[in-house]
Amino acid sequence: MSKAKKTAVTPTREENFPEWYQQVIKASDMAENSPVRGCMVIKPWGYGIWEAIQRDLDRRIKETGHENCYFPLFIPLSFLEKEAAHVEGFAKEMAVVTHHRLVAEDGKLVPSGKLEEPLVVRPTSETIIGDAFARWIQSYRDLPMLVNQWANVVRWEMRPRIFLRTAEFLWQEGHTAHATAEEAMDETLKMLEVYRVMAEEVLAMPVIVGEKPAHERFPGADKTYSIEAMMQDGKALQAGTSHFLGQHFSKAQNIRYQTAQGGEEFCYTTSWGVSTRLIGGVIMSHADDNGLRVPPRIAPKQIVFVPITRADGDEALIEDFLAPIVKDLSAQSFGGERLRVHVDRRPLAPPEKRWEWVKKGAPIICEVGPRDVAGGSVAMIRRDGELKGQITPKDELVSRAAAILEDIQKTLFTQAATALKERTVTVRTLDDFLAVFADDTTFGRKFVRARWCGDSDTLAKLDEYSITIRNVPFDQDGEAGTCVLSGRPATQEVIFAKSY
């Protein structure tokens, strides 16, 4: 019997994927649970990844004409009461503030000073931003109104999981107002495409782009679109959404404008957002049984040097050797930003430091000892490959660093894209459909592409098997066929999957 390969993370993905996910977060020192149930503490490595995502996406948002602003965390209950469908969708998740101070009674602090109107802690900002739009927009000359905010939101979560489902999470939410439905729809799809490009080119995470079915729409939206990614366990993760809100919110909040002809019309609005859930997607898309593998575009530190010192004088020798290398690398660019280079000078054993960076998923890890200095080289580990250092001349590292990082980025994307392609199957019969989902193992789960009639009475069968409809992909064949669930006529194909 062969001996099991030793891994830095236990259990492995195959043994217990949910627990493996938690252990990767712990091993990479990204985040931890907080004393507040359902909330997380994002540690520097995890927050550095979020900052890299922010920088890239913020640039894309601004390049499409949007400006950043900030709105209050607290929303008057009366604002939410104006939009019944919206409130119904979030009612069970809302945190509500009812008092404005604490007083000491019998040695304990108790709430006092009941508010005249309860305040809801922001679950999303359509209502309070809509209130501002109603003041800011008077004429067609004020349109389109294009704003974005980076903020935190709160939605009570019964089954929390770090990055994937937390009571408080970080996100960006874009909100826009337009004169016509066509302009608003163009905006909705434009920002969906921004998300697709960011997910694939920056996170190295391939996605399926499409429209959500009616029962999965954002509360109060006319249409919701999403990008859906496959995790390594074959489950789907909704990685971003963009909503065409029609005139529902503008009518509820009186967002009107005077037309060029002197008439008055309600605006058409949109909203769109992604959150720290993306980090969970990066983990489950790319990490392996030795820890995280961070796509270079979002790695807080892209090249890490680990000095190997054994005798007096080694430290100074290696420092002198690394100084010009670090200087030359730090002057280079990758992905539109300066290379992020780090020398780990902590007083820890070199193997301990090396394994820490392996578990964190730094794209390039270079060990440097006296023999490497003598040979003018480094022992380079690429986190997308074997963990044995390859002797690399220092001049080659300096000249090819950006190209190596780009190759790692492409490798991670290709691995994920290959898995998505190989584990997405098209079926035409209910028997085949159920046979695919009968395999509920980590590496056996698949996405199913099949026709669906759109009738709500078919959803009970999906609930029975814990299967969801992810979206209606944009790339449709348009051919007539039958619904895989009901046998009724159907032309649209949808993506069925187990999901997070």
UniProtKB/Swiss-Prot annotation:
Keyword Disulfide bond: no
Biological process, per Gene Ontology: prolyl-tRNA aminoacylation
Catalytic activity: tRNA(Pro) + L-proline + ATP = L-prolyl-tRNA(Pro) + AMP + diphosphate
Listed InterPro entries: aa-tRNA-synt_IIb, aa-tRNA-synth_II, aa-tRNA-synth_II/BPL/LPL, Anticodon-bd, Anticodon-bd_dom_sf, Pro-tRNA-ligase_IIa_arc-type, Pro-tRNA_ligase_II_C, Pro-tRNA_synth_II
The keyword Manganese is annotated on this UniProt entry: no
PANTHER family: BIFUNCTIONAL GLUTAMATE_PROLINE--TRNA LIGASE (PTHR43382:SF2), PROLYL-TRNA SYNTHETASE (PTHR43382)
Enzyme class: ligase
Major localisation: cytoplasm
NCBIfam families to which the protein is assigned, alphabetical: proS_fam_I
Protein name: Proline--tRNA ligase
Organism for this UniProt entry: Paramagnetospirillum magneticum (strain ATCC 700264 / AMB-1) (Magnetospirillum magneticum)
Annotated keywords: Aminoacyl-tRNA synthetase, ATP-binding, Cytoplasm, Ligase, Nucleotide-binding, Protein biosynthesis
Family: Belongs to the class-II aminoacyl-tRNA synthetase family. ProS type 3 subfamily.
Swiss-Prot/TrEMBL domain comment: Consists of three domains: the N-terminal catalytic domain, the anticodon-binding domain and the C-terminal extension.
Gene Ontology terms, MF aspect: ATP binding; proline-tRNA ligase activity
Localization per Swiss-Prot or TrEMBL: Cytoplasm
